[in-house]
């Protein structure tokens, strides 16, 4: 009897152990399934994030012809089609759409859990989020941007951009000609933007406008010695696969388009801007516009990518300049003729 009871007790213990082992196996199996599901989810998140950044790049690089051509030599490798727009648009509709788009992109990005991304993806996430947030802050001041200027204005910079437009084949030449033909439309958006600035008391000072008008006038006067003629002739000379006769034909067409499309576009821009003379309410800097101080802070943060205050940046700049001056003084003491030798391009 005692033996039977002892045997039964052992069986009971064995059953309990087996049940515990079974529970552990179920738990471990469930845990591994959960872990596998989590790993799959992480891999899916990584894949979706790569798809998102790829789409973001393609969409932003192909907004207009001049931007895409500047950044990509072979856009077909990215399966990008020819952009519908030739130039960036500065009209009211596009400005509003850009503001909405930035907010949507931020919300899309927020949906990704950073801990499920690789370190490289996390860095991309942080850089992109920082960029979008700074752009969003800047979009709150849509008509504060100085789009016109003697040298840095878009009416001046577009000449440099066109003169450096990459020409590798006939397709590039034809795209370039389309840009010349579409310059008038681009300037129309600058005119519209400037008129909106007038309404908001954000237009250029009369002195700044005078300098812009002088720059435009100088372009108009250069009918024969226009930089777009000289630079085009140099660039097309290096293109292989086009015979001499065809190159001459393209050079003549370029010169004709400058006379019939480019210069008239500048003349129209000059006329419209001249009519806005006297509307500049601020002869000082951005700070002196309504909300100018706030805009300046946002602009500096966007341009530098830093969250330091203006005062902190000035202090850092001053220290850096002072450090450079001390080094220069030491060098001049050691090499008394260093400045003259530098000016004469002699080896020190």
Feature-to-residue mapping (PLM):
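Short, Lys/Arg-enriched N-terminal segments with co-localized hydrophobic residues
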Residues: 1-4
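N-terminal maturation segment of proteins
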Residues: 7-18, 28-348
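Hydrophobic core
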Residues: 23-27
């Amino acid at each position: 009897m005692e033996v039977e009871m002892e045997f039964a007790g052992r069986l009971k213990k064995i059953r309990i152990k087996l049940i515990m082992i079974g529970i552990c196996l179920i738990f471990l199996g469930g845990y591994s399934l959960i872990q596998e599901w989590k790993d799959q989810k992480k891999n899916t998140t990584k894949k979706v994030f790569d798809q998102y950044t790829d789409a973001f790049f393609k969409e932003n690089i192909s907004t207009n012809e001049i931007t895409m051509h500047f950044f990509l030599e072979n856009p077909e490798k990215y399966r990008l089609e020819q952009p519908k727009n030739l130039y960036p648009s500065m009209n009211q509709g596009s400005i509003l759409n850009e503001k909405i788009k930035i907010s949507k992109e931020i919300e899309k990005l927020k949906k990704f859990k950073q801990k499920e991304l690789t370190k490289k993806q996390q860095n991309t996430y942080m850089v992109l989020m920082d960029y979008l947030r700074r752009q969003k802050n800047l979009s709150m001041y849509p008509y504060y941007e100085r789009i016109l200027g003697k040298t840095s204005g878009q009416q001046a910079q577009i000449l440099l951009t066109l003169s450096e437009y990459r020409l590798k084949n006939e397709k590039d030449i034809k795209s370039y000609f389309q840009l010349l033909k579409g310059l008038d439309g681009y300037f129309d958006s600058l005119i519209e933007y400037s008129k909106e600035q007038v309404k908001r008391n954000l237009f250029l000072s009369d002195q700044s406008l005078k300098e812009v008008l002088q720059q435009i006038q100088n372009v108009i006067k250069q009918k024969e010695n226009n930089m777009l003629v000289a630079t085009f002739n140099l660039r097309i000379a290096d293109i292989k696969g086009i015979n001499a006769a065809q190159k001459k034909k393209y050079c003549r067409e370029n010169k004709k388009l400058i006379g019939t499309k480019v210069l008239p576009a500048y003349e129209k821009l000059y006329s419209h801007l001249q009519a806005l003379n006297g509307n500049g309410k601020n002869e000082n800097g951005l700070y002196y516009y309504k909300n100018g101080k706030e805009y300046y802070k946002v602009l500096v943060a966007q341009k530098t990518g830093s969250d330091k205050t203006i005062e902190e940046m000035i202090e850092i700049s001053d220290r850096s300049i002072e450090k450079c001056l001390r080094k220069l003084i030491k060098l001049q003491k050691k090499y008394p003729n260093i400045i003259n030798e530098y000016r004469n391009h002699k080896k020190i």
